[in-house]
Amino acid sequence: MSTSNLFTPLQFGKCLLQHKLVLSPMTRFRADNEGVPLPYVKTYYCQRASLPGTLLLTEATAISRRARGFPNVPGIWSQEQIAGWKEVVDAVHAKGSYIWLQLWATGRAAEVGVLKANGFDLVSSSAVPVSPGEPTPRALSDDEINSYIGDFVQAAKNAVLEAGFDGVELHGANGFLIDQFLQSPCNQRTDQWGGCIENRSRFGLEITRRVIDAVGKDHVGMKLSTWSTFQGMGTMDDLIPQFEHFIMRLREIGIAYLHLANSRWVEEEDPTIRTHPDIHNETFVRMWGKEKPVLLAGGYGPESAKLVVDETYSDHKNIGVVFGRHYISNPDLPFRLKMGLPLQKYNRETFYIPFSDEGYLDYPYSEEYITENKKQAVLA
């Protein structure tokens, strides 16, 4: 597979990637009760910076205490959190790789008990629950919306200017707060923040503009899950026009890249259920164009990743492929794919174990990778 375009460079903002395999943002619940990354988080990311020039996208990270709707997920608002992340960033950079922080606000998808324990309400664009029988959020006021935008801006500053991240990814996917404003089944407002395509886009676009003003356009990307029905999304009648408007405005604003979660959320060996036939997001990749990178995520394996880069988008040199679960169990994933080595199986039971390194640090490198590293060390 070493001849595949997966192993050609990709200019990504100010980062020159040496291959197009990207670590997916994945919640792992390995932060302490105050949202500070635990010490072994540094080791986890360093393990996956196994080849110089690798791009790592971190797990979703709360922009503020009120935006943190789950226990043991990290934040980026406190000095302790910033310091914890800076250790991770410095270690990844020392290995010659790059790391971007995903910025996150949960909105109505939060666990109510976590919010109440800190004195916060469940909130969203409108008073519409994720599904019938679920808790109903309170609609954010205009002042609160602007305050949340400010939280995103401060979090981006903390990440890029203080912790040293190469950039930030705005989490506009999977039914979280930005997505809750974008899509009409959730957003039933009639003010400047809802009621039409342009107004539903306003929250995400204003966040993007102001974050770019704070840290620069080469340091800002956006993730979207256009076809996903997760957490009450993906059922709107004007879905394509809504996302077309949003993506075209993002392109005009000048973000560094677009990250799209595909409609296929299953492993490549089990493609039985697809939420939409456009499994490689060709509808929205065409809208975005070829000038800047597009990251594609959604159940890719070695062969399907090669296929999407070398055949589906053979005329698009700025496509990156995002790996999640396979990257958990194969910290040397880029090396394995390049050399055609078999992948280790992952264990779902250990994905989410707070305060534990089980299933987090204990997947070994391949013997071939270890041998190659020893050779390089001797040559150095």
From Swiss-Prot:
CDD domains given in the database record: OYE_like_FMN
Binding site for FMN: P25, M26, T27, A60, Q102, H171, K223, G299, G324, R325
Membership in a protein family: Belongs to the NADH:flavin oxidoreductase/NADH oxidase family.
Name this polypeptide is given: Probable inactive reductase easA
Signal peptide (UniProt feature, chain positions): none
A molecular-function term among this protein's GO annotations: FMN binding
UniProt induction comment: Strongly expressed in planta but not expressed in axenic culture.
Function (record text): Probable inactive dehydrogenase; part of the gene cluster that mediates the biosynthesis of fungal ergot alkaloid ergovaline, the predominant ergopeptine product in E.festucae var. lolii. DmaW catalyzes the first step of ergot alkaloid biosynthesis by condensing dimethylallyl diphosphate (DMAP) and tryptophan to form 4-dimethylallyl-L-tryptophan. The second step is catalyzed by the methyltransferase easF that methylates 4-dimethylallyl-L-tryptophan in the presence of S-adenosyl-L-methionine, resulting in the formation of 4-dimethylallyl-L-abrine.
Gene: easA
Annotated substrate binding sites: H171, N174, Y352
Cystine connections: none
Keyword terms: Alkaloid metabolism, Flavoprotein, FMN, NADP
UniProt GO BP: alkaloid metabolic process
Domain of life: Eukaryota
Transcription as UniProt keyword: no
Pfam family, one: Oxidored_FMN
